[in-house]
C-alpha cells in the first residue's frame, strides 16, 4: 500500500520544527528514521497532512554523561546505541537491547526518540528505558516538559506526547553501584517481532542481598509493563534460583498478552516468564563482579 498525500518540510532547527508543529496542529507529524511512522503511513493507519523532517536539526544526536545521568539525543540511531562507548560502559543493557531491533538497515535509520514517541508495544527500547527509570525531555513553543517513561507510554501506538511537542532528549539515571542489568527476548527469527521479552535490573547490598529490583516485560499487553509485585519478592532476598522462579511466576500474573499467529496468549506468557528468569539470572551474574570490585 501507499501513503496518503502530505506536505513535507525539512526543519533546520528545533525552533523551526516547533513552529511547523504548532502551525500543523494535530495533522503534523515528525519524521526522522521512519521505522514506526512509515509502516503506519503505508497502511493508512496514520494520515498526517504535514511531515516535519528533523534529520538536519543540529544537536539532537549527541550522547552526554554527567555524574547522575546519561543524556541521549532523540535523533540517536539504534546502531549508535550498539557502538557508543558511553552507552556500553554505563548502560550496557541499552546496547544489548538495541542489537535486537530488526535488521542493520533499520537500526541505521531508526531513532530512540521515534521509538518512544510512537510507543509501539513490540519495541525493545521502551521496555528497557522503563526499567531504567528514564524520562524524556519534550519541547514545544509553550515550554519544556520532563515526562517519566511510566507516564509517556499510554497504550499501543499511544504516547502522552501532545500535539506541538517534540522529544529532544532521553535522560537515563546512572545505575547504583553493585547493579547488574540484562535484556533478552524470543522471536521466531532474529529481526522478527518478539513473542516475549524482559528487562531486569538488580542491585546488591554489602551482604549480597537484593536492595533494588526492576522487572519490565515486552509482549504482555498494550505497552511495556513494570512488574512491581515481582520486584517486591526479590527485595532483601539472596536471589536464589527459588527467589528468581517466584519472581518470574509473579511477573506474568495479570498480564494480557495478545494472541497472534506466532503464539497463543498462554504461550506468550510462558515465553515472558522464561525471559524474566533468564534476565534475572544474567543481571545477578553481572551485579556480583561489580559488587566485588567495590570491595577491593
From Swiss-Prot:
It catalyses: 6-hydroxypseudooxynicotine + A + H2O = 2,6-dihydroxypseudooxynicotine + AH2. Binds 1 FAD per subunit. Its cofactor is FAD. Disulfide bonds: none annotated. Keywords: FAD, Flavoprotein, Oxidoreductase, Plasmid. Pfam families: CO_deh_flav_C (PF03450), FAD_binding_5 (PF00941). FAD binds at residues 30-37, 111-115, 124. Pathway: Alkaloid degradation; nicotine degradation. InterPro entries: CO_DH_flav_C, CO_DH_flav_C_dom_sf, Diverse_Substr_Oxidored, FAD-bd_PCMH, FAD-bd_PCMH-like_sf, FAD-bd_PCMH_sub1, FAD-bd_PCMH_sub2, Mopterin_DH_FAD-bd. PROSITE patterns: FAD_PCMH. The keyword Oxidoreductase applies. Its EC number is 1.5.99.14. Residues 1-177 form the FAD-binding PCMH-type domain. GO terms for biological process: nicotine catabolic process. One of its GO terms (molecular function) is FAD binding. It comes from the Bacteria. It is an enzyme of class 1 (oxidoreductase). Molybdo-flavoprotein enzyme complex involved in nicotine degradation. The subunit gamma (large subunit) contains the substrate-binding sites, the subunit alpha (medium subunit) binds FAD and the subunit beta (small subunit) has a 2Fe-2S ferredoxin-type domain which binds 2 2Fe-2S clusters. Heterohexamer of 2 alpha (kdhA), 2 beta (kdhB) and 2 gamma (kdhC) subunit. Dimer of heterotrimers. PANTHER family: XANTHINE DEHYDROGENASE SUBUNIT C-RELATED. This is 6-hydroxypseudooxynicotine dehydrogenase complex subunit alpha.
Amino acid at each position: 500500500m501507499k501513503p496518503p498525500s502530505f506536505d513535507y518540510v525539512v526543519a533546520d532547527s528545533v525552533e523551526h520544527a516547533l513552529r511547523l508543529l504548532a502551525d500543523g496542529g494535530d495533522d503534523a507529524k515528525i519524521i526522522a528514521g521512519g521505522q514506526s511512522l512509515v509502516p503506519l503511513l503505508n497502511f493508512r493507519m496514520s494520515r498526517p497532512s504535514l511531515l516535519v523532517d528533523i534529520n538536519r536539526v543540529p544537536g539532537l544526536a549527541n550522547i552526554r554523561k554527567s555524574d547522575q545521568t546519561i543524556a541521549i539525543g532523540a535523533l540517536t540511531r539504534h546502531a549508535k546505541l550498539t557502538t557508543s562507548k558511553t552507552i556500553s560502559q554505563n548502560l550496557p543493557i541499552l546496547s544489548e537491547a538495541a542489537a535486537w531491533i530488526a535488521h542493520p538497515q533499520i537500526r541505521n535509520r531508526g531513532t530512540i526518540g521515534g521509538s518512544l514517541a510512537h510507543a509501539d508495544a513490540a519495541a525493545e527500547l521502551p521496555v528497557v528505558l522503563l526499567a531504567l527509570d528514564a524520562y524524556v525531555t519534550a519541547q514545544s513553543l509553550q515550554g519544556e516538559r520532563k515526562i517519566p517513561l511510566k507516564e509517556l507510554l499510554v497504550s499501543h501506538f499511544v504516547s502522552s506526547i501532545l500535539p506541538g511537542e517534540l522529544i529532544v532528549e532521553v535522560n537515563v539515571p546512572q545505575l547504583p553501584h553493585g547493579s547488574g542489568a540484562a535484556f533478552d527476548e524470543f522471536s521466531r527469527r532474529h529481526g522478527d517481532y518478539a513473542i516475549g521479552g524482559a528487562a531486569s535490573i538488580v542491585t546488591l547490598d554489602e551482604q549480597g542481598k537484593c536492595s533494588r529490583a526492576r522487572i519490565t516485560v515486552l509482549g504482555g499487553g498494550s505497552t511495556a509493563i513494570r512488574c512491581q509485585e515481582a520486584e517486591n519478592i526479590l527485595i532483601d532476598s539472596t536471589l536464589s534460583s527459588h527467589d528468581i522462579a517466584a519472581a518470574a511466576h509473579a511477573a506474568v500474573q495479570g498480564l494480557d498478552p495478545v494472541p497472534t499467529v506466532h503464539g497463543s496468549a498462554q504461550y506468550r506468557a510462558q515465553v515472558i516468564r522464561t525471559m524474566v528468569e533468564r534476565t534475572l539470572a544474567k543481571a545477578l551474574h553481572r551485579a556480583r563482579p561489580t559488587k566485588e570490585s567495590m570491595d577491593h
